[in-house]
Amino acid sequence: MKKYLTFIFLISFISIEAQDIRIPIDTSVTTNSEVLINNQKITYQAKTGMQPVWNDHGEIIASLYYTYYKRTNIKNSSKRPIIMSFNGGPGSASVWMHIAYTGPKVLRIDDEGYPIQPYGVKDNPNSILDVADIVYVNPVNTGYSRPVVKSGKKLDKSLFFGINADIKYLAGWLNTFISRNNRWQSPKYIIGESYGGTRVMGLAAELQNKQWMYLNGVIMVSPADYKVLRTGSALSSSLNLPYFTAAAWYHKMLPDELQNKDLLEILPLSEEYAINKLIPAMAKGGFISDTERNEVADRMSYFSGIKKDVILQHNLDVPKDYFWKELLRNENGFTIGRLDSRYRGLDKRLAGDSPDYNSEITSWLHSFTPAINYYIREHLKFKTDVTYNVFGPVGPWDNRNDNVREGLRKAMAQNPYLKVLVQSGYYDGATTYFNAKYTMWQTDPSGRMKDRFFFKGYRSGHMMYLRSEDLKKSNDDLRDFIKNSSSNGKSAKY
């Protein structure tokens, strides 16, 4: 298809230094293209480039790389929904959802998500561009985004690399973006994957309270709630059991009574046991009776596919990395993946407490790294010698004062329009689906807003959209959420 290229240089006199290569801090390249989505021809404009981050004194402190897709074969785009998209890490570029989930192009992989050569991209017939425009944002030190440091000064990491600093500067950047692109009338959504779930929970409150930008929806894809994950408590450990069940079922390691049933039939059984029996038992720690300890180990073995004696050796608290090593150890010697436990790996030794590597990451990087570099240069026509950071240096990350869950609750209480969608893969061992459910349940302990929370699960891993069947299903779920979270002319009141 023919593409029309326009260069727009806004404030190109100041530049940032990265790898001793200078990048304009305020520049964009525009191309036009089309894609067939749900058998409907969608024409669109893609604008990609750099937009500055300003501090409270009006000084430029960074420039963020973004890609903005806007449908063009409609009458009025200013009132069309817009989705602001982030990945996680922290330290990850927005590459994953950009060229594998919601964008108009997806990378070339097979139906189960495994890489295919030659690497590249193809049209995405499931993209949500038919119902919403999308901007993919790369935080500082990811993609081509970089800090701007005055000559003779050192980088002040506290401006960017922490849970609250990250939220603050990104909210300001989004305000600028919305103003520049005339999107204040649009219904607004933010979507974040993995740590991006933490990010968008915080952004919902920051945008509303500091930028006066009210959202229609917050979408969390495989969200990481570190307030639970960091505790190492009986609670956080118990929430892993339903994931163990899903992974063991996929690899056919469960007892026949469970293995012969469908996954969605057995997960509620594992969830119920985790909530009603396992959490209370593990809370007793070393004071649990021998009888109860053995009963619990029996049931954990039943639901996890690993041996009772191994569970007892771990005092009922089996780490996930040990599970990835142990599940198939005596079956065929493979390990299973962390972010997607359908993937198998091969270690140097059968012995050990954790896999040598994450088998799914090596597979994904086969595809994503060449695909995004090719796509940006050859399709979007943005060319630079600066390295595209799929994963960038953002440490040490300041995790103090993590109040994002409460921030989301307050934002929802103050904004009757605001709804939340959580999407998780059952085979995700990093940010498990049951942990995501728990986060959703705990966000509003009163239960008075529970009709504004929605959960969707998929037979995939962390990036459920890599599986062809779930790419369609998850995008359709996004469409439904956008439709159902539209105000439809209703007043914002209780």
Walk through the language-model features, giving the residues of each.
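Alpha/beta-hydrolase fold catalytic core
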Residues: G285-T431
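N-terminal cap/lid subdomain of alpha/beta-hydrolase-fold enzymes
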Residues: G58-L159, W441
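Catalytic-loop region of hydrolases
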Residues: A18-I82, A100, A492
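A catalytic-pocket lid/entrance helix-loop region that shapes and gates access to the active site
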Residues: P104-R108, A204, Q208-R299
